[in-house]
C-alpha cells in the first residue's frame, strides 16, 4: 500500500490482510505481529462470515519510547471487525513520548469496522497518534478514535501532558477529511464550553460509505 512514510522505525507492529474465501468467510490471509503488539485468532459470531479480530498489548499498556504501527488491508468482498479487549493505557512518561501509527486500506467491496477501545493517557504521559485511512469507492469503513480524561477512578483527571491525534481519510487517493485533535490540559481548561463542554471523554466516529464521509 502507498501509505505515507513513517518518521521513525516502529518497535511494535501489526499487519493484517483480510480476504474472503470461496465459502464467503473472511480470514486473515496475512497476519503478523511484533511484541508489544499481539494478534489473537479470528472469531466468528455471525453467519455471514464476518471476522472479528482482537489486538492486545501483553505489557498491559503503552510505554514511553514505544513506536507502534498497525496496518490493515481489507480486500474486495472481505468483512472484518478489528478491536481491542480493553482500554489502551498510556503509562506515565518521564522524558519521552509514545507514538502510534494506524494505517487502514479498504478496497471496493470491502467492509472494515475499526473499533479500538478508548485511549487512556495516565498522568505525565505524552501521546502522538497518526491515523491514515484510505478507502476505494464502493468500500465501507467505520472507524472510532476516542480518548478519556485519564484514570479518573484513581483521582487523575486531565493530568497528562499532551495528547495529539491526527486523522486523514483519502477516497480513491484524494484527501476527503482532515481532523486534528491536540489536547494540552496545562495550557487551557478542556472542560470549558467550546472544548469538551464538561465531558471527560472525547471521540470521533468516522463513517465512509459510497464515498460519503
Model-inferred region functions:
Residues 1-118, 123:
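N-terminal, charged/glycine-rich beta-strand/loop interface patches
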Residues 67-69, 128, 202:
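Intrinsic-disorder/low-complexity, polar/charged segments enriched in Ser/Thr/Lys/Arg/Asp/Glu/Gln
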Residues 77, 136-138:
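Outer-membrane beta-barrel channels and translocator barrels
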Residues 118-121, 126-128, 141, 145-200:
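Short acidic-hydrophobic catalytic motif
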Residues 205:
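Glycine-rich, often acidic-flanked micro-motifs
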Residues 210-213:
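Conserved small/polar residues in nucleotide/adenosyl-binding loops
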